[in-house]
Design a protein with these regions (language model features):
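Bacterial N-terminal signal peptides
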Residues: 1-12
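STAS-typified acidic loop motif
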Residues: 18-19, 23-51
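Terminal peptide-recognition signature
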Residues: 40, 65, 105, 171
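Soluble non-cytosolic domains of exported or imported proteins
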Residues: 42-50, 71-78, 95, 99, ...
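Extracytoplasmic/secreted envelope proteins and their assembly/folding machinery
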Residues: 49-56, 77-81, 85, 102, ...
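Short, glycine-/small-residue-enriched flexible loop/hinge segments at domain edges that mediate gating
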Residues: 59-76, 90-96
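Glycine-rich beta-to-alpha active-site loop
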Residues: 85, 89-126
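Charged, glycine-interspersed solvent-exposed loop segments at helix/strand-loop junctions
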Residues: 123-191
């Protein structure tokens, strides 16, 4: 099963009641390796949680979620994290998981990265919420997965246009990463 969206246009209500068009980046969801892995790549848009849930319902033997994402909408990431957490799935990052993607990654039972993977953190921002509201959601999500208040405070000092990518030693020390796999330890992204 492959779900690919190249461009999604949605009408998103804003707090003022006005509506604006919002263009969301492309994403793909694929079930791999005889149904044992689900790969998500691209932007965490509003449509992702529903499609993610459908893909998992059709592939009940999935044990690991492979993430490769620059981020996206924080609420979409929280919904994906809820699904991952409820199914007790592991998460794996072969390359990059940044911004809102880190919330989905933290939901993994085992949180595995390749030796060359990068996890990126910064303040939340996005349409429909103030910066303060977005950062409260981010803080609550990170607290849910037991990140220290010192780590969260550091993330909240990184402006939304910047990205902090702690090294693997730091990520292991604070409990974000539970395992580091050598590059190529997991099969390549092929069905």
């Amino acid at each position: 099963m492959i779900i690919t969206v190249t461009m999604l246009v949605s009408l998103a209500p804003q707090p003022t009641g006005a509506a604006t068009y919002e263009f969301e980046g492309p994403y793909a969801i694929r079930v791999l390796h005889q149904g044992l892995e689900l790969e998500f790549s691209g932007t965490l848009s509003w449509a992702v949680p529903q499609q993610f849930g459908i893909a998992l319902a059709e592939a009940p033997n999935v044990r690991i979620v492979r993430l490769n994402s620059p981020g996206g909408h924080i609420k979409a990431a929280v919904e994906v994290a809820d699904i991952i957490h409820a199914r007790h799935l592991d998460t794996y990052v072969p390359q990059t998981c940044a911004s809102a993607c880190t919330i989905a990654f933290l939901a993994g039972n085992r949180r595995i990265v390749s030796a060359s993977a990068k996890l990126g953190f910064h303040q939340a921002h996005g349409p429909g919420l103030s910066s303060e509201q977005s950062n409260v959601l981010l803080e609550v999500a990170y607290q849910r997965f037991s990140l220290s208040s010192a780590f969260i405070a550091h993330v909240l000092r990184i402006p939304p246009w910047d990205l902090w990518t702690p090294d693997l030693a730091e990520l292991r020390k604070v409990g974000i990463v539970t395992e580091v796999a050598p590059d190529g330890a997991f099969a390549a992204s092929v069905p």
